[in-house]
Amino acid sequence: VEQPDSSSSDGIFYYDEASQTKKISDDHVSEYQTIPLNKKQYYSLDITYFKSSLDSHLLDLLWNKKDILFNSARQSDK
């Protein structure tokens, strides 16, 4: 006997007493997609980023600071 799952407010799951497991109702099977557990690699996603003028300015300042620190370390090694 199938009874609606009282813990699920959307009615997607029901409790199957025969197997004593939660199952997905037939009304929502088309919305459900299983994850293939035997797959080790998935498709790659394109990654995009946005760099503002402030980002560029801050990166330039950091780069210049690195150069100053590197050059002062080289001078102190002499």
Curated annotation (Swiss-Prot):
Signal peptide: none annotated. GO terms for biological process: proteolysis; red, far-red light phototransduction. Its EC number is 3.4.-.-. GO terms for molecular function: metal ion binding; metallopeptidase activity. The keyword Transcription regulation does not apply. It comes from the Eukaryota. It is found in: Cytoplasm; Nucleus. Its cofactor is a divalent metal cation. Keywords: Cytoplasm, Developmental protein, Hydrolase, Metal-binding, Metalloprotease, Nucleus, Phytochrome signaling pathway, Protease, Signalosome. Probable protease subunit of the COP9 signalosome complex (CSN), a complex involved in various cellular and developmental processes such as photomorphogenesis and auxin and jasmonate responses. The CSN complex is an essential regulator of the ubiquitin (Ubl) conjugation pathway by mediating the deneddylation of the cullin subunits of the SCF-type E3 ligase complexes, leading to decrease the Ubl ligase activity of SCF. In the complex, it probably acts as the catalytic center that mediates the cleavage of Nedd8 from cullins. Belongs to the peptidase M67A family. CSN5 subfamily. Component of the CSN complex, probably composed of CSN1, CSN2, CSN3, CSN4, CSN5 (CSN5A or CSN5B), CSN6 (CSN6A or CSN6B), CSN7 and CSN8. This is COP9 signalosome complex subunit 5b. It comes from Brassica oleracea (Wild cabbage).
